[in-house]
């Protein structure tokens, strides 16, 4: 059985992050190992939330997994609570990702045209560097705009979407999928 490590927050409310990733990957027949970046009362899309930052726990967890000779067949990241955490996760990837293992990055940082309040203004620039070398990234339309420096447009044309995808892949990404936008007159995400 393949073993994937997913590194992202645990949101008590919000059907996202580790609470969504673990059962979905498990149902696909993959052993899913979760490493939490933060414990959140509810996800950061709510007006307010309570958060326990787990940055200081990432290195000891990584060290323990290495001592136990635990291997992974891929890495999947979601919400990363700070630039400092990105640096810890890059070190984790250097230690555990083997050549040929997929790196899947969901560059979670905003929704509805706005960056999450908990993140700093320099976060999108740092995320651009983090996604270099990823096999797949899945930004939503807000995150795609933040990564490419474009103004938010909730309903980009097909041409604009293709331009954004080309820009995203220009950051050294193999494949990019933009999620969560609607077409005028259409429902769905």
Predicted features by range, described:
Residues 1-105, 109-117:
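Conserved N-terminal subdomain of the carbohydrate kinase-like
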Residues 117-189:
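Conserved phosphate/ATP/ADP-binding segment of small-molecule kinases
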């Amino acid at each position: 059985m393949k073993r994937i490590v997913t590194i992202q927050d645990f949101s008590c409310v919000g059907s996202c992050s580790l609470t969504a990733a673990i059962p979905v990957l498990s149902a696909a027949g993959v052993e899913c190992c979760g490493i939490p970046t933060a414990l959140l009362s509810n996800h950061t899309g709510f007006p307010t939330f309570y958060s326990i930052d787990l940055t200081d726990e990432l290195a000891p967890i990584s060290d323990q997994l290495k001592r136990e000779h635990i291997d992974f067949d891929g890495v999947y990241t979601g919400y990363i609570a700070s630039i400092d955490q990105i640096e810890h996760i890059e070190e984790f990837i250097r230690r555990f990702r083997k050549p040929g293992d997929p790196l899947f990055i969901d560059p979670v940082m905003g929704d509805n045209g706005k960056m999450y309040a908990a993140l700093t203004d320099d976060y999108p620039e740092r995320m651009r560097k983090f996604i270099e070398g990823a096999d797949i990234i899945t930004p939503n339309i807000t995150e795609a705009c933040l990564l490419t420096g474009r103004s938010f447009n909730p309903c980009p044309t097909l041409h604009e979407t293709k331009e954004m995808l080309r820009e995203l892949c220009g950051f050294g990404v193999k494949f990019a999928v933009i999620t969560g936008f609607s077409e005028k007159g259409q429902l769905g995400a």
